[in-house]
Amino acid sequence: MNHLGDYDVIVIGAGHAGIEAAHAAATLGAKTAVFTMSLDAIGNMPCNPSIGGTAKGTLVRELDALGGVMGLAADATYLQSRMLNKGKGPAVHALRVQTDRKRYHEYMKHALELTSGLAIHQAEVVSIEVEDGHVKGVVTQLNGEYGAKCVVIATGTNLGGKIFVGDAWYASGPDGMHAANALTESLKAAGLPLRRFKTGTPARVHRRSIDFSQLECQPGDPDHELQPFSFLTDAPMHNKVECWIAYTNPETHRIILDNIQRSPLYGGMIEGVGPRYCPSIEDKVVRFARKDRHPIFVEPCGENTEEMYLQGASSSLPEDVQNAFYRSIKGFENIEIMRPAYAIEYDCVDPTSLEATLESKNVRGLYGAGQFNGTSGYEEAAAQGLLAGLNAARNALGKEQLILPRHTSYLGTLVDDLVTKGVMDPYRMMTSRSEYRLTLRQDNADQRLTPIGRDYGLVQDDRWARYQHTQAILDAERRRLHETHLRTADLRAAMEAAGLAPAAEGGIAEELLRRPEISYPLLAGVIGWGEEITPMLAERLETEIKYAGYIARQDRMIRDVARHEKTLIPEDFAYEALTGLTLEAREKLARIRPKNLGQAGRIPGVSPSDVAQLSIALAAGPRKD
């Protein structure tokens, strides 16, 4: 064994979680190293070439507000941008971009190379070193030993990876990367409760083999409506490519069903549990038998490649069946598969074995992030990576760690769900998972999280100055709207010009903006646009004014819940001695060890009656094991 150095924080893996973890730890001043099997796989997109989407776009904005990298990378490498759910309320608006996967990798690799205090190593980590229940370092396949105060596991689907295509399988990570089998055994030996999950990816096909005249075109939003992910991005945006939509048909479904037993998922070869909200095409055909078609989104992988990604058509069927069912689709009759679809099975940890800081309860100083924690998706991974890296660094430096309550962010909701409720299948963030989604909008992520990022050392001076300036602009415009009166004649003229039924009378601009038919641009046509108010800020201001009553109600809910969050539970509380609890509640509370009464009430199987009993016991005084 060759001792090659010591670090405050070591990050294993340089995918979306590992990048944010390494960047966050180094930004906080911790001496940091990130290990990856290949420098050419940093920030790889082994599945869809896109960032954002419903709820995921909010996670990216939150990452950016805290000082993360993903938003800037997406803004620098996007090909097409669309705001999803524009016909619905602002709570579910979601930015999504197609990205150039090669340029995204290059951006992220360079971002890490430019990060001060961060060492980048191409090496496979085969084991962690643990002493007296605390991580002490890692060992590589070349017998290199590196000491560390804290380690972040961000292994993606490489950990114990196994790829399936029909009845063929082989040990591998995604995109031909090695499987990290030795590390799995080391983590098991350290006492981590591991399990098997599964995910999949569709075929990549050659652009020239698609008849686009048979597909529906899916353009991006008009250039003047485009919004960046990062609060720091000022560059003008324009769409560069179009996406397309194809549809399966009854013949496609017949081919799949006739060969369903050749799928390793249905033939019993795959043990791992797949994602509920991103099913394979064979799953869709079986589970939704009454549907006669399913959409397939045809997306470019980059500007300098002819590979096209078939979103919505992941599969693990044999190659001959893939050829047959893809070619049964209108526009795909002559399809050329460049990379076949496959399923991948991998190891991950039971997230209820983690603290809300993402530190392991089994091995102190060891943190998890991304798919290792049982989630799916680049955005979920990156968000956890930032939190794990931040907390690993603060732990190593002897500082207080950050716990984000679920009412602060989608990231806080995600982590609370993982460590409190656990997962039965790969976890995907959705707006419906948050009870505070009107407050946790993508447009106000900076207001919610940038001060926290500043307090914990992640937000640098340029971002902080930008945040303060933005808040000053919004505050000034809110005051102007509150103080400005519109004459009835002027308002009616503006409404008639916009094709709207004229209002009865004028009034204070702020009060008028509460009306559903009146928009900020309409008012601005009368009183002028506020100084430095962009369309993006105008939309944010309008949302806050129009929904002020609902937001205030949600704020009251948050304050009520916060009282339970402040009722702390001793780590050694003797649940088994509390006879008023149900047996299920006692078992789950003893296993998960919630930090406070609020978290206890969110554990599945713990009823309001159990929470009341626990509250009484806590008020009565110490009850320890």
What is each PLM-predicted segment?
Residues S38-D40, K56, M83, T184-N323, ...:
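An anion/pyrophosphate-binding glycine-rich loop and adjacent beta-alpha core
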Residues H23-S127, E131, L142, A154-A171, ...:
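Conserved N-terminal/central alpha/beta ligand/cofactor-binding core
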Residues Y309-T375, I403-D416, T534-K588, R593:
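A glycine-rich dinucleotide-binding beta-alpha-beta segment and adjacent secondary-structure elements
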Residues G5, Q141-C150:
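Core beta-strand elements of the Rossmann-like FAD/NAD(P) dinucleotide-binding domain
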Residues R433, T439-R441, A445, T450-A612, ...:
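Extended, charge-enriched "interface" segments that sit outside catalytic cores
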Residues H3-A17:
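Beta1/beta-strand and adjacent pyrophosphate-binding region of the FAD-binding site
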Residues C150, T155-L159, L317, K330:
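Glycine-/small-residue-rich beta->alpha transition segments that form the dinucleotide
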Residues A381-L402:
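Internal hydrophobic alpha-helix adjacent to the cofactor/substrate pocket in enzyme cavities
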